[in-house]
Amino acid sequence: VTAKTTRILITGAHGQLGQALLANLPWLPEFSPSRLRMKIPEVSLVPGSAVAPGSAIEIVALGHQQLDLTSADLSERLSEINADVIINCAAYNAVDAAEQDMAAAMALNAEAPERLAIWCRQRGAWLIHISSDYVFGNVFGNVFGNVFGNVFGKDLGNALGNVSGNAAANMLGNAPRALTESDVCEPLSLYGQSKLAGEQRLLKANPGALVLRTSWLYSRFGSNFVLTMRRLLTERPELKVVADQIGTPTWAEALARLIWQLLIWFHLKPEKSAVLSGCFHYAATGQCSWYLFTQEIAEQIAKQQCNSAPSSQAAVPLQTASPSQATLHSPANPAPITPGCRITPVSTAEYGALLNRAQAPRPAYSALDSSALKDAMAAMPSAFRCYLPKDYPSPIWLSWQAQLALMLSGLGAPSLD
């Protein structure tokens, strides 16, 4: 075992990805649940941290209350912690609120990453920064607006002008390609602008840093779309869900395991340097709308209910939307079953009207192509790869449906007991 010690700082540790990173520590070769404890004696000034005794990797996990990235003394705090790697999971994620509070969004999403980048460059530390698919605008908006206009008529075509992904693919017989790192970023919202500014300022200050763009994160932690839909499907007779925004749902624990693989690689390298730098995309494979995502959630939950329920109990079929809507938006697989909840597709504009409040604009199409990152990691020497138990499938490069199934079934949820 190498004698080199690598200290890893996780910022925003109370958030969804931060919790996923900590929950997946036991899957690392260097860790086991019985060896994990919640204090670093060498860094007693930092509470709420974890270390594997006897290993050469130390984890310092801090939430906003423990480490405010917008504070004037950030550099001094970072120097006290003295990390070799910083994983920046902290972010201002209130997309709609950012429209009214751009200063707060810029402070955490743009200025803080730049300050982290400068400190890491000066100290020779590696920075991994998490960004968002919302840095993109309507890359395919005009194209699909024309398609809908030709098929459904001008008025409906204009109304659905930003629809892309599965609906258009069903008509064209050819799904649009996912977005690559070289596609033009034109964020529509102030939140997206703040995230793009953070990427640009960070990489300008520290070209050796790594930016990971991801999309539609969900997990068993915090508040997210899957947990919300899982609850609402049992509470409401009808759910109206946006069908004209297309992206890729991504399991935060799959992203966490990818990051740990990169960190093991960094730790085992003989020289202290970044293993990857620049901007890369990570998401599950495939694409869907929020409406199709909700249908898949309902279907998978219903299957679980059927598998666990006595054979005498019949499942209640899901109520479908109107025929014209269902033809346009429904997946090819059978309608999901859930206790009597009707799932209806609506446009972004219709959903905004239902909320009766202003919404920040969202990209109509933001599915991410992860092939560049996959190729880069395929070149990783096999001895550096973080392994998983042989009977557990690695979730990193799975489809969004397969990742969702793992999350909902509870697989890949290691216990720290």
Residue ranges and their predicted role:
Residues 6-27, 31:
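N-terminal Rossmann NAD(P)H-binding glycine-rich loop of SDR-like oxidoreductase domains
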Residues 361-417:
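C-terminal amphipathic/interface module of NAD(P)-dependent oxidoreductases
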Residues 20, 258, 265-315, 319-320, ...:
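Mid/C-terminal beta-alpha module of Rossmann-like enzyme folds, strongest
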Residues 100, 107, 111-115, 170-212, ...:
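Catalytic helix-loop patch of NAD(P)-dependent Rossmann-fold dehydrogenases
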Residues 200-248, 253-261:
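NAD(P)-dependent short-chain dehydrogenase/reductase
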Residues 69-108:
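NAD(P)H-binding glycine-rich loop region in Rossmannoid oxidoreductase-like domains
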Residues 79, 100-128:
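NAD(P)-cofactor binding segment of oxidoreductase domains
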Residues 95, 100, 133-153, 161-188:
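Active-site "gating" loop of Rossmann-like NAD(P)-dependent oxidoreductase/epimerase domains
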